[in-house]
From Swiss-Prot:
Highest classification ranks of the organism: Eukaryota, Viridiplantae, Streptophyta, Embryophyta, Tracheophyta
Record family assignment: Belongs to the intron maturase 2 family. MatK subfamily.
Subcellular location: Plastid, Chloroplast
GO MF annotation list: RNA binding
One of the GO biological process terms: RNA splicing
Keyword 4Fe-4S: no
Stated name of the protein: Maturase K
Alphabetically ordered keywords of this record: Chloroplast, mRNA processing, Plastid, RNA-binding, tRNA processing
Main location class: plastid
Length: 508
């Protein structure tokens, strides 16, 4: 961000209030391309052999505002560079550039907040990991009783996102451009349903839409910032730039008259002291847990739903919010099934000559691998059938043996790595077995042989690569500490290098 500041050579107030002129600067699109993920979109379009230039952007914006834009016959579309396949490309150029530009005020706000504190903030990459939420849940959720399981709805209209952006970006021209762009050239249903999106929306506006959606989510989550008395349990250093992360909110010590300044609830909303309230979110899934009674959590549900609906136009349906008790209900979050169970323990005590036994029950937070949804994901990916029986992958039969083994091994290691925090490994071993047999069946199909004959001929060592357990990996990485760490393998391991959910574990 510092490089961008030096390159723009603009005052911070000018950057915040006048973003529209930056759309016509060529280096903006170079920055957007360099910060993008994967290959450039320009190299994926065979019909585009020129760099994005100021002239192209000016022509596109001018034609966007024309009354009869992009209306022509089929014959003209072959000659008009703004029709057909190139039209999608130019839309993508504009959306990438604008998504990069509109993030500037948020990045500057984050930088100014750091400078205002006049202290050095330690950057920790571990806070980016989605697995860092589970140690937090282990420490806090075992003492809680009820949880609100919330599925965040999408905004009802694209105008809601633009209106939210108005509070952050004061440039009317930029807001008008993004409103016109989204309304004219994108289907709102395609934006909120990526699986059904067309090329022009699914591939062009992912970054722009995620930015707008996350800004909207941060607005309605601001109520929790208003409620808390203490600082966050863990501070996400990247929350200011609105990237998709988990939000950590700490303990609320005194929660009295929380909505006293909110006009709609000033007369009738008074809450008793609630010593423990926690909120976490990942993508559309959010959890609000409390130590209070069922009546209190039910009031929270009513108050929050009403507040969000009237002030942020988030229309929650009753089936989107569940009130569950942690002791007898499994919570599905980030590809895990979590709950709080009572762990009995017998303690022998002795006082002088008398001894006696005491039975104690300790609450423990458990995380398990949901075997049925995971098998359904494997069946959808054609690794097995719906019953969990391994099948071959004909698509990969044309690859070399080593390539087939590497691909299956990569999938197996990723799943094992992601689900390493499971308390019981039996389900994980079954998944490894399915992938192992699927790889063997694929190799046997390629060589026109049976699985048993193939393994007998080549030996079982062929598949050991992707069957390596987490214990073996850590023992190779830390040979001196392998004996010390080996005792922890039987419980759970949380890896803080995982920043997104595994595709096979993302049950949708």
């Amino acid at each position: 961000m510092e490089e961008i500041q030096r390159y723009l050579q603009l005052d911070r107030s000018q950057q915040h209030d006048f973003l529209y002129p930056l759309i016509f600067q060529e280096y903006i699109y170079a920055f957007a391309h360099d910060r993008g993920f994967g290959r450039s979109i320009l190299s994926e379009n065979p019909g585009y052999d020129k760099k994005s230039s100021l002239l192209i952007v000016k022509r596109l914006i001018t034609r966007m505002y024309q009354q009869n834009h992009f209306i022509g016959s089929t014959n003209d579309s072959n000659q008009n560079p703004f029709l057909g396949r190139n039209k999608n490309l130019y839309y993508q150029i504009i959306s990438e550039g604008f998504a990069f530009i509109v993030e500037i005020p948020f990045s500057l706000r984050l930088i100014s907040s750091r400078e205002g504190k006049n202290k050095k903030i330690v950057k920790s990459q571990n806070l980016r990991s989605i697995h860092s939420i589970f140690p937090f849940l282990e420490d806090n959720f075992s003492h809680l009783n009820f949880v609100l399981d919330i599925l965040i709805p999408y905004p009802v209209h694209v105008e809601v996102l633009v209106q939210t952006l108005r509070y952050w970006v004061k440039d009317a021209s930029s807001l008008h451009l993004v409103r016109f762009f989204l309304n004219e050239y994108c289907n709102w249903n395609s934006l909120i349903l990526p699986k059904k999106a067309s090329f022009s929306c699914s591939k062009i506006n992912q970054r722009l839409f995620l930015f707008l959606y996350n800004s909207h989510v941060c607005e309605y989550e601001s109520i929790f910032v208003f409620l808390r008395n203490q600082s966050s349990h863990l501070l996400s250093t990247s929350s200011g730039v609105l990237l998709e992360r988990i939000y950590f909110y700490g303990k609320i010590e005194c929660l009295v008259n929380v909505f006293v300044k909110v006009k709609d609830f000033q007369a009738n909303l008074w809450l008793v002291k609630e010593p423990c309230m926690h909120y976490v979110r990942y993508q559309r899934k959010s959890i609000l847990a409390s130590k209070g009674t069922f009546l209190l959590i039910k009031k929270w549900k009513c108050y929050l739903m009403t507040f969000w609906q009237w002030h942020f136009l988030l229309w929650f349906q009753p089936r989107r919010i569940y009130i569950n008790q942690l002791s007898n209900h499994f919570l599905e979050f980030l590809g895990y099934l979590s709950n709080v169970r009572m762990n009995p323990a017998v303690v022998r005590s002795q006082i002088l000559e008398n001894s006696f036994l005491m039975n104690n029950s300790i609450k423990k937070f458990d995380t398990l691998v949901p075997i049925s949804p995971l098998i359904a994901s494997l069946a959808k990916a054609k690794f097995c059938n719906v019953l969990g029986h391994p099948i071959s992958k004909p698509v990969r039969a044309d690859l070399s043996d080593s390539n087939i083994i590497d691909r299956f091994g990569h999938i197996c290691r990723n799943l094992s790595h992601y689900h390493s925090g499971s308390f019981k490994k039996k389900s994980l071993y079954r998944i490894k077995y399915i992938l192992r047999l699927s790889c063997a069946r694929t190799l046997a199909r390629k060589h026109k042989s049976t699985v048993r004959a193939f393994l007998k001929r080549l030996g079982s060592d062929l598949l050991e690569e992707f069957l390596m357990s987490e214990e073996d990996v850590l023992s190779l990485t830390f040979p001196k500490a392998s004996s010390t760490l080996r005792g922890g393998y039987k419980s759970r391991i949380w890896y803080l290098d995982i920043i997104y959910i595994n595709d096979l574990a993302n049950y949708k």
